[in-house]
């Protein structure tokens, strides 16, 4: 996590490389620290240093279309594109091989309920980024998909409604077309929530109440298979592997490794990736 004047550290990067992994860093900070465009250059310098230290990929901020992650009243894709431009310039000047991923917006249709001071629908936000020229300052478009309750092979049939964020194809088509089909997608979070093995899901996550662990495992494998064969998804990170928190934000319900230590998704993903 960045904060003004914080020096970049290579500890995570070195540790990952020593273990034979590449490392993608999603770099965010406190919304108050960027209010009014303050400290954009400080942030850009920080991510540039991470690139110099060997980061293989950097996601520039996170879910900047909601006021939990960006200052309320200032949510604007043009403003974010300015931060992205400065960051991209610094990153590429320090390490041209570092993959630059735009921050993935929160999938949402809530702007009508809460107002644009607090949230922008992600389709509007992504379109605004494209109009502001963000495509010139990214290697890959960041995407989050975390509210599915049906197979990613389906583009209809969600019992809630037909809103595009419900569907894997809806998210892919929306984000890919926003940049004129010219930029590949990077899923920095893709997961399916199952409360199986836990107490009841919090009420605001009740939409996933009927999703089983077996369905989670099947759908993750299907999503990876579709992404690999599509030619338009460069990277996909499963959210998540082994989180255990299960409070008002039930991250443990997204975990592949379940409370009983079983991991059905490990087996399905092993099959679809050919053992990699």
Tell me the role of every PLM-derived stretch.
Residues 17, 35-63, 73-94, 117-139, ...:
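An active-site-proximal structural segment forming one wall of the substrate-binding cleft
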Residues 46-77, 98-109, 136-152, 185-190, ...:
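Active-site groove signature of glycoside hydrolases
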Residues 7, 64, 75, 197, ...:
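Aromatic-rich peripheral "rim/lid" segments of glycoside hydrolase catalytic domains that contact
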Residues 1-77, 105-107, 155-163, 247-258:
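N-terminal substrate-binding region of glycoside hydrolase catalytic domains
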Residues 5, 11-17, 139-204, 224-237, ...:
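Glycoside hydrolase catalytic-domain groove-lining segments
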Residues 70-74, 110-121, 152-163, 198-211:
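Short, flexible/disordered intra-domain loops and linkers
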Residues 114-135, 164-185, 206-210, 215, ...:
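Short flexible/disordered coil segments
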Residues 82-126, 167-168, 172, 176-196, ...:
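Aromatic-lined carbohydrate-recognition surfaces of secreted/lumenal glycan-active proteins
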């Amino acid at each position: 996590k960045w904060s003004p004047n914080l020096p970049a550290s290579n500890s995570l990067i070195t540790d990952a490389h020593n273990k034979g992994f590449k490392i993608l860093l999603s770099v965010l900070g406190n919304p108050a620290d960027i209010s009014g465009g303050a400290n954009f250059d400080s942030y850009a310098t920080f991510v540039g240093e991470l690139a110099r230290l060997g980061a293989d990929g950097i996601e520039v901020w996170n879910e900047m279309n909601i006021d939990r992650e960006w200052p309320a009243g200032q949510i604007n894709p043009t403003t974010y594109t300015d931060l992205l431009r400065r960051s991209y310039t610094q990153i590429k000047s320090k390490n041209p091989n570092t993959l630059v991923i735009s921050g993935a917006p929160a999938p949402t249709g809530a702007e009508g309920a809460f107002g644009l001071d607090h949230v922008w629908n992600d389709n509007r936000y992504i379109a605004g980024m494209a109009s502001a020229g963000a495509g010139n300052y990214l290697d890959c478009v960041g995407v989050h998909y975390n509210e599915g309750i049906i197979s990613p092979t389906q583009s209809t049939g969600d019992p809630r409604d037909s809103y595009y964020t419900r569907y894997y194809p809806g998210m892919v088509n929306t984000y890919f077309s926003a940049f004129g089909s010219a930029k590949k997608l990077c899923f920095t979070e893709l997961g399916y929530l199952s409360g199986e093995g836990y107490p009841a899901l919090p009420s605001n996550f009740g939409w996933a109440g009927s999703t089983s662990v077996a369905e989670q495992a099947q759908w993750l494998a299907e999503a990876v298979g579709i992404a690999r064969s599509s030619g338009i998804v460069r990277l996909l990170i499963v959210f998540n592997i082994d989180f255990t928190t299960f409070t008002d934000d039930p991250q443990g319900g997204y975990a592949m490794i379940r409370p009983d230590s079983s991991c059905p998704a490990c087996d399905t993903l092993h099959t679809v990736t050919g053992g990699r």
